[in-house]
Structures are given as structure tokens and as C-alpha cells.
């Protein structure tokens, strides 16, 4: 519910599926009542292993409060997960217009992870494909309950954050998690960002397409760590 869509704007829909038998799925963007269908497409899911499917949706009308609907008619055992909807022109999973607005603000230093999220985030989850990063329950559910039913998600990883900082011209400021992550895991994060390709985690960064160290100079220990 409550998805703002723009007329003629292509969106990328994705989800993972496993089924006992072939099932035709229908994906649509509609009004809140489901009476107006702005766009609709179908695909066939088949197989007992998780398989990712992506389709493009282009609504023929704008709606600030649209619904995303996934349906199927055939009876059977169906599992779905990792549902996502992004503008086709997204920047590393972020809305392009928001990134442009951040440029205009002239942000000089950008901190991440921020707030209570910093006390839950595990940077190593970001090494997995986004569909394989487990959600985690927020210890301050009051903040996230209205939006994500009390859960946070690791949809942005270290490489995405550095790309954002470079795009908007900001100095990256990374907050490590000394509460749940070990000193060794946090040291590995520093090495991933700043080590050259001769170090284990610098080599991993290079293997992921980023040969030169990120040279992150600003680091902090947790968020409100005294509480």
C-alpha cells in the first residue's frame, strides 16, 4: 500500500519464487481499491529451488497511494520472497531524484549506518546478493513498526554507500557496530575499505570490481553507545 507512482515511469519489479508445479503469476500496479489497473504483466514460475524473476512495469497514470499486487490462480504450494519495486533509473537501489537532491544540498560528510540502525547492521551481510540478506528485527520497533512491521533491511551495502558519497561529493563517515560484531569483523571492514589488493579483504573488494582502496578516513564506534 501507499506507493507513489509516476505516469510513464518504468519500474523494475523483482521477487524470488519456488513452486511445486508451474504457476503463472500476475503483477500489477493498481489504485488502493484495486479497481483501476495502471499496468499489469505476467510470468511463469517453476521449480523447487528459489529462482529470481524480474519484470518491468510502466503505469499509465500517476497515483500517490498505489498498490502493488501479486496474484496467481492455480492451486498449489507457492513460496515467494524478497519482493522489490525500484524505479528503472535507480542509483544503487536508491531513487535518482533523492540522490540529485542530496547533490543540491551540498552535503560534505555523510554518515552511515546511522541512528539505531547502526546498532543492528552487519556489514558482511552486504557481501551477499541483496535477495539473500536476512532482515533483522529492530530493537526500537516503535520507529520501524509503521513502515516495515518492526524490521530493518540491508538493501544498501558498503560499495553502494561509497558510490553514493562519490556521486554527491561527500566524505564517507562509517559507523561500526561494536555491540554485535566482533573486533575482528570490524577490523575486516576497515581492511575492506582501505586495504590494498594484497590484503584478504582488500582483495575481496577488488574481486567485486573496486580495485583501488576507498580510503575512508572517518570512523566511529556505534550509535549512542553509552546507553
Range-by-range predicted roles:
Residues 154-155, 161, 168, 178-197, ...:
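Catalytic-domain carbohydrate-binding cleft regions of carbohydrate-active enzymes
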Residues 62-63, 102-104, 166-167, 210-215, ...:
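Extracellular/periplasmic catalytic domains that process cell-envelope and extracellular macromolecules
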Residues 93-97, 153-161, 196-211:
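Alpha-helical scaffolding within the catalytic cores
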Residues 71-73, 113-116, 199-227:
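Active-site groove signature of glycoside hydrolases
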Residues 172-176:
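Short catalytic-loop micro-motif centered on adjacent basic/acidic residues
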Residues 1-154, 171, 181, 187:
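Extracellular and organelle-lumenal recognition/adhesion modules and their flexible linkers in secreted
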